[in-house]
Amino acid sequence: MKKYLLSLLAAVTYTTAQSVSGSAEGFASGVTGGGGATPVYPADTAELESLLSSEGEQVIVLTKTYDFTGTSATGTACYSWGTGEGCQLILQDDCGDTPSTTVTYDAAGKTPIPVASDKTLLGVGSEGVIKGKGLSFTDNVSNIIVQNIKITELNPEYVWGGDALTFDGSSNICIDHVETSLIGRVHYVFGYNPNSGITLSNNFINGETTYSTSCDGYQYWGLELVGKNDSITFKGNYLYKTSGRSPALSGSTKFHACNNVWSDNNGHAIEGNEKGQGLFEGNVFQEVATVVSSTFWEAGDLFLSSADGTGNDACASYIGRNCASSIYMNDGGDYTSYTDVSWLGDWSGLTIAECAEAREIEGTVPTSAGNTL
């Protein structure tokens, strides 16, 4: 009887986790992923890779840790940021005049799992963890949902040791309630091929790390966005202990950042080139040394909503409502002069997510972001 009850309890628990919680907001609205496909539970890492890469609709449920670590490789690593304790090395064959060494690392971290179209990947509670390998969305894949999982331990000591989530020629993808931590290079990287209709929501970008380029436990590599005409909704995310590229609008990206919390950033948050477009509203910047990098921001199109509402009504002509006010707490740099919104005319036809005032979300986002469902 006891065994039967335990089995019944497990079945009930899994049933509640087999369907997506909520729906995608913003640019990925309408995404269905694996739809109503019968949920499958991969037994091991090999089956997980096989299911994610297979054709057709799939709902894949993670109930444990899938550990890809332990596949050793050796290579040359450069001491590009010093030899002190906590300094990252960079994996590359030629270090030039920079001191170098031979290192052993996990080979799996450098090769992410390719995810095929029409997939839903769900975690049960806090149990769904992928350790030592990331996910990639390339070659025109579309209609994918990833929700309530954790991706962690991708060679954190080494730049080029692995990226958590890679997008390069993809569309209609929602990444929701995902925690990324201890990542060798970038948490979210968007390659040069277009990525349209992407929503990153309620995620925890945990930059607290054992190794970093600044040798101080703050990760520099947050979000690198180099795609052509990418459209990304970034809502409800918590970014903790980063020091740069959070995000880097390095391509011609349309980036809507709404109701996010940046906390304890000892470098800079926003950077980008002359083609990037960033609409930032209803956000909280708390203890951010430099909100926008004057060194790395190359006069692209950027709007930062004000704290007191001044100028936020300028958004109404383009998105049908005023932009939500933001909160700036003990922050540095110039974050008051990014007031032009005329470039939002380029966003005609895009689905713009609703956005609350920052004061309404500042206490909830840090505790709800990540694999907390």
Curated annotation (Swiss-Prot):
Gene name, Swiss-Prot/TrEMBL: pelC
Glycosylation sites: N140, N229
Bilayer-crossing regions: none
Keyword entries, A-Z: Carbohydrate metabolism, Cell wall biogenesis/degradation, Disulfide bond, Glycoprotein, Lyase, Polysaccharide degradation, Secreted, Signal
Its biological purpose: Pectinolytic enzymes consist of four classes of enzymes: pectin lyase, polygalacturonase, pectin methylesterase and rhamnogalacturonase. Among pectinolytic enzymes, pectin lyase is the most important in depolymerization of pectin, since it cleaves internal glycosidic bonds of highly methylated pectins.
A family per Pfam: Pectate_lyase_4
One GO MF term: pectin lyase activity
Natural source organism: Emericella nidulans (strain FGSC A4 / ATCC 38163 / CBS 112.46 / NRRL 194 / M139) (Aspergillus nidulans)
The protein's name in its UniProt record: Probable pectin lyase C
Catalytic residues identified in the record: R245
Signal peptide: 1-17
Similarity field: Belongs to the polysaccharide lyase 1 family.
